[in-house]
Amino acid sequence: MSKVCIVTGKRPATGNNVSHAQNKTRRRFLPNLHTHRFWVESENKYIKLKVSSKGMRIIDKKGIDTVLSDLRAQGHKI
């Protein structure tokens, strides 16, 4: 299961854990993803999307219908 936001495209970034002694070990910074059900009034059904919290704010701002049409235009099967 990929850790990618379907709306924003956010994916894991890499970096270092740095201890007090400045020892560095590699780590991954994971996006804040949630599987969320959105009610789509035009289709009269729920759509389940894996989105980050930023993606949820974009859906709140633009509307689920606009975001879904953009995703379908990009080739996502939803």
UniProtKB/Swiss-Prot annotation:
- Biological processes annotated in GO: translation
The GO terms describing molecular function are: structural constituent of ribosome
- Cystine links in this protein are none
Extract the Pfam families matched here: Ribosomal_L28
- Top-rank taxon of the source lineage equals Bacteria
Keywords for the protein's UniProt record, in alphabetical order: Ribonucleoprotein, Ribosomal protein
A GO term from the CC aspect? cytosolic large ribosomal subunit
UniProt similarity note: Belongs to the bacterial ribosomal protein bL28 family.
Among NCBIfam families, the record links this protein to: L28 (TIGR00009)
Official protein name in the record = Large ribosomal subunit protein bL28
Q: From what organism does this protein derive?
A: Francisella philomiragia subsp. philomiragia (strain ATCC 25017 / CCUG 19701 / FSC 153 / O#319-036)
